[in-house]
């Protein structure tokens, strides 16, 4: 084969001839055939069949061929005649296949091309096949959809042969007009890069069938007048229009396209860095050397000048030569070295090994390059030995790659801003790509960094040793990770793989990066901790069940939505004995209480620490450690916060606790708690719903509730403090929900809150001998409670019912409609029947016969910044603050006492209270909540009754 032939010159002004054009076309076809042969030879026997038969399955709509859908699917490739090898391949697939004459039927398809790395130095066994299938511009939408479905079916067939095939269906006129119907996926660049992709197509494509590129016939120096030249060729019939397909010229890359293209290559670089680094640097080179010829133009000029040597025209060789010529000087030596390593690893051809059958030309070409680079055999051996790369090697290389990718993105982004250009990428695409970049590269607190984005085949270690720093003397805390450390004494001289203050974080990092597998031998030197090999083995099992390795990249659909948690794994008490202080005393359980949050007679909370591992929809893994303060409540609060934005899909919560010290019981209790809390807050796939959730733990009470989308909690040290808090006013109806183990000593209160209803005032009572406990749940769910002596049910209820009736009546008078008015007062008795506590409805017991006595009313007044005071009216007798000052309560008590017989001893009850609308000086309250009236009623009654008792 002649590598260099006579140059061809086309002078559109002086005249051209058809013979020269045919000679030029044949020269491009010669280069094309060499590339096809190279692409074919790089495939296995079964894979070669896919490449051979591709044009035929679209040229014929034959039911025996792969991808067939129905008889209406468009077919037929312009000017295509299958070769004997193609027909034989079809008959190997379907013995009944025979080629039929289609007559003069107009083909539906214009051309088919293979583009990218096949047939080039950059092709490897992992490379996919990207095919452009171009249809007629007048093809109906239904036909286009059918072709797309056929392409998808064909891709599934090719996958069974070990080929990753992607067929993109479009027409050339849509491409020229920028109307391509694509979005960002793993295989095409959406709106990100039009001209850069066309530049790549022209220099890498292999013509498979149909019309030839019109671009071949337009000299490189005439790209600026491409359309005029093309029209002259067609109008003057130098070529037949149906023989050529026109994707348009690439005179230059528009500046506004660089940002989109850069982001796209970063997107690809997350999973396939070597190719993307080369392309990203080419984009930067193009951006910095505007005015210089593009690689596609250099390729075309070389063919016009007589160059047909496939080695010298290899797209990756040309790309490298362009970058090498651009990166000159010692200050860019490290970047040039990264380019060389990227090209070598992209080729995927280990030169230090002899198994290169079928790859002789690639091995020869690659060897020429590395010889010119001056690489030593040690450098080659290091790159060829990727199977033995360790975490430290990958971490260093990843840092270099991330720095280069980040540098490229920032530079291109700045250039786009400086030129004031609008990036040639849609807002949706750039948002999507940015999210993937963020998920892969962004560092943030707690995120587990994944260090091996396709750099090494595996980082699995045979032996890993976890050493607590206290093993090395002193009081240092934290953990060190070693490999192959049989003798602990060698730790001082062995390199540390990783340091962490947290054993769980170290384990998760090892697992997510593939260092730790089920076959890895473990060694633990726990020091002051009590961690063990068995605990780490159990933790590994929990991690494997929670998150299969390797972690797949997030799907496009997930990245198009906001990030949300998919599932959580809670590791409880890692390396901790929660009963250590009891064990030292020889005590394990001092009562029948088996709640892990209030264990034994001491009500001990056995949850000391939690490591919360979260896997989210962008496939990020994060770990948050809780070991100080209210560990469990803090973790619960953060889980609630993460769910609030997406309540329709609750994340799964798994809990693991080592079997030491009631581990399974602790895990079960924590899992129950999280399920119990999430359920009412997000019932029905909506929320967060307004409610207050009460948890009893470690001799304290915790009340959880949301403020908007933000959860918060209040810790209360006693039952009395809890009741005071439940009585506080609310902005809206907030029912009280108790955890299944909370307040088991107060079953009546649980029954009261369970029976609570909105827009009602409910009075509950329980009589125990001569004492009664009353609870009032008001219209917004506040719970006010008190105890009092009881002589009869009527004497117990009538005072409070009349007080509430007066309050409701006054509200009715203030409102012109029913909005904001409670339905009324309902009475319930708390009883225990069949071992269960329940609230049973009791009609109001006021018989209509008035109780003896007179009305006692209080009217609250605010004077300036002074505290709230009350004027009190006993029947028609007024006692004002102005007149009595601090002696008002004693004066009222003395007056009431004077009206009673000397032997009468019973409490006084207020029948009504008026509160000012500026009770809270910060706001004007149109309707003051019932619980606030009850609070001031209780304060005044207690004060009056104390003074009554003193006057006896």
Regions found by a protein language model. Name each.
Residues 1-91, 178-182, 188, 195, ...:
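Nucleotidyltransferase catalytic cores
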Residues 67-126:
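Well-ordered mid-protein domain cores that form the structural environment of catalytic cofactors
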Residues 113, 120-147, 164-169:
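Catalytic metal-binding acidic patch
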Residues 127-135, 141-143, 161, 182-188, ...:
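Extended helix-rich, non-globular scaffold segments
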Residues 129-135, 139, 146-152, 340-341, ...:
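Amphipathic alpha-helical scaffolding segments
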Residues 152-153, 173:
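Basic- and aromatic-enriched surface patches that contact anionic nucleotides/nucleic acids
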Residues 156-162:
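Arginine/glycine-rich "motif VI" loop of SF2 helicases in the C-terminal RecA-like domain
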Residues 163-185:
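Short, conserved secondary-structure transition motifs
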């Amino acid at each position: 084969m002649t590598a260099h032939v006579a140059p061809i010159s086309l002078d559109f002004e002086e005249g051209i001839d058809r013979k020269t054009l045919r000679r030029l076309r044949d020269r491009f076809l010669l280069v094309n055939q060499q590339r096809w042969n190279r692409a074919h030879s790089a495939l296995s026997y079964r894979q070669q069949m896919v490449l051979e038969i591709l044009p035929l399955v679209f040229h014929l709509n034959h039911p025996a061929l792969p991808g067939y859908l129905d008889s209406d699917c468009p077919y037929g490739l312009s000017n295509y005649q299958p070769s004997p090898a193609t027909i034989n391949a079809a008959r190997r697939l379907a013995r009944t296949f025979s080629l039929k004459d289609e007559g003069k039927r107009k083909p539906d398809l214009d051309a088919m091309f293979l583009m990218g790395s096949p047939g080039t130095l950059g092709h490897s066994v992992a490379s996919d096949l990207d095919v452009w299938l171009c249809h007629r511009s007048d093809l109906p939408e239904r036909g286009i959809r059918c072709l797309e479905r056929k392409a998808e079916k064909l891709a599934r067939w090719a996958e069974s042969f070990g080929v990753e095939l992607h067929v993109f269906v479009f027409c050339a006129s849509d491409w020229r007009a920028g109307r391509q119907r694509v979005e960002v996926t793993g295989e095409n660049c959406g709106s990100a890069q039009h001209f850069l992709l066309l530049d790549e197509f022209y220099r890498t494509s292999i013509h498979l069938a149909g019309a030839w590129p019109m671009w071949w016939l337009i000299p490189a120096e005439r790209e600026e007048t491409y359309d005029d030249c093309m029209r002259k060729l067609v109008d003057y019939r130098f070529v037949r229009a149906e023989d050529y397909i026109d994707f348009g010229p690439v005179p230059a890359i528009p500046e506004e396209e660089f940002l989109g293209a850069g982001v796209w290559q970063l997107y690809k670089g997350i999973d396939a860095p070597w190719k993307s680094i080369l392309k990203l640097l080419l984009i930067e080179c193009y951006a910095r050397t505007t005015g210089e010829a593009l690689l596609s133009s250099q390729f075309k000029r070389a063919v016009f000048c007589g160059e047909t040597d496939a080695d010298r025209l290899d797209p990756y060789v040309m790309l490298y030569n362009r970058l090498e010529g651009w990166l000159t000087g010692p200050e860019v030596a490290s970047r040039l070295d990264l380019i060389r390593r990227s090209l070598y690893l992209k080729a995927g051809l280990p030169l230090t090994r002899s198994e290169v059958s079928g790859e002789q030309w690639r091995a020869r070409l690659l060897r020429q390059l590395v010889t010119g680079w001056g690489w030593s055999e040690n450098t080659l051996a290091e790159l060829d030995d990727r199977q033995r790369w360790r975490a430290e090697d990958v971490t260093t290389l990843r840092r270099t790659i991330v720095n280069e990718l980040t540098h490229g993105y920032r530079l291109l982004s700045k250039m786009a801003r400086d030129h004031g250009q609008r990036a040639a990428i849609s807002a949706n695409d750039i948002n999507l790509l940015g999210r993937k970049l963020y998920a892969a590269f962004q560092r943030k607190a707690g995120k587990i960094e994944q260090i091996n984005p396709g750099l090494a085949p595996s980082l699995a270690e045979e032996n890993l040793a976890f050493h607590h720093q206290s093993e090395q003397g002193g009081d240092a805390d934290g953990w060190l990770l070693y490999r192959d450390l049989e003798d602990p004494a060698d730790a001082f001289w062995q390199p540390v793989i990783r340091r962490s203050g947290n054993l769980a974080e170290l384990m998760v990092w090892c697992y997510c990066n593939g260092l730790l597998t089920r076959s890895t031998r473990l060694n633990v030197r726990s020091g002051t901790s009590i961690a063990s090999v068995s605990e780490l083995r159990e933790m590994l099992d929990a991690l494997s069940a929670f998150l299969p390795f390797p972690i797949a990249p997030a799907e496009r659909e997930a990245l198009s939505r906001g990030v949300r948690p998919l599932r959580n794994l809670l590791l409880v008490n890692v390396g901790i004995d929660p009963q250590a202080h009891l064990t030292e005393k020889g005590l394990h359980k001092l009562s029948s209480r088996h709640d892990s949050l209030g264990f034994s007679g001491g009500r001990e909370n056995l949850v000391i620490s939690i490591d919360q591992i979260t896997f989210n929809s962008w496939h990020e893994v994060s770990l948050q450690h809780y070991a100080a303060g209210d560990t469990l409540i803090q973790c619960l609060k953060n889980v609630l916060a993460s769910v609030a934005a997406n309540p329709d899909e609750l994340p799964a919560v798994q809990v693991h606790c080592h079997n030491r010290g009631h581990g399974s019981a602790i895990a079960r209790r924590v899992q129950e708690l999280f399920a119990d809390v999430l359920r009412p807050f997000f019932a029905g796939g909506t929320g967060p719903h307004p409610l207050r959730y009460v948890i009893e733990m470690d001799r304290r009470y915790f009340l959880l509730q949301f403020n908007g989308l933000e959860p918060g909690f209040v810790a209360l040290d006693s039952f009395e403090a809890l009741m005071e808090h439940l009585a506080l006013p609310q902005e809206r109806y907030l029912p009280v929900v108790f955890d299944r183990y909370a307040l088991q000593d107060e079953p009546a209160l649980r029954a009261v809150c369970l029976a609570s209803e909105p827009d009602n005032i409910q009075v509950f009572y329980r009589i125990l001998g001569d004492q009664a406990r009353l609870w009032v749940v008001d219209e917004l769910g506040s719970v006010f409670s008190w105890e009092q002596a009881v002589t009869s049910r009527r004497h117990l209820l009538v005072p409070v019912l009349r007080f509430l009736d007066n309050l409701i009546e006054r509200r009715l008078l203030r409102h012109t409609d029913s909005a904001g008015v409670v339905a009324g007062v309902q009475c319930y008795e708390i009883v225990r029947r069949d071992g269960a506590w329940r609230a049973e409805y009791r009609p109001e017991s006021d018989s209509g016969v008035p109780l003896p006595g007179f009305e006692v009313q209080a009217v609250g007044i605010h004077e300036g910044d002074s505290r709230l005071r009350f004027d009190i009216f006993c029947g028609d007798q007024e006692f004002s603050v102005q007149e009595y000052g601090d002696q008002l309560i004693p004066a009222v008590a003395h007056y009431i006492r004077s009206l009673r017989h000397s032997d009468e001893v019973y409490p006084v009850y207020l029948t009504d209270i008026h509160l000012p609308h500026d009770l809270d000086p910060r706001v004007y309250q149109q309707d003051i909540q019932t619980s606030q009236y009850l609070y001031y009623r209780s304060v005044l009654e207690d004060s009056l009754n104390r003074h009554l008792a003193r006057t006896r």
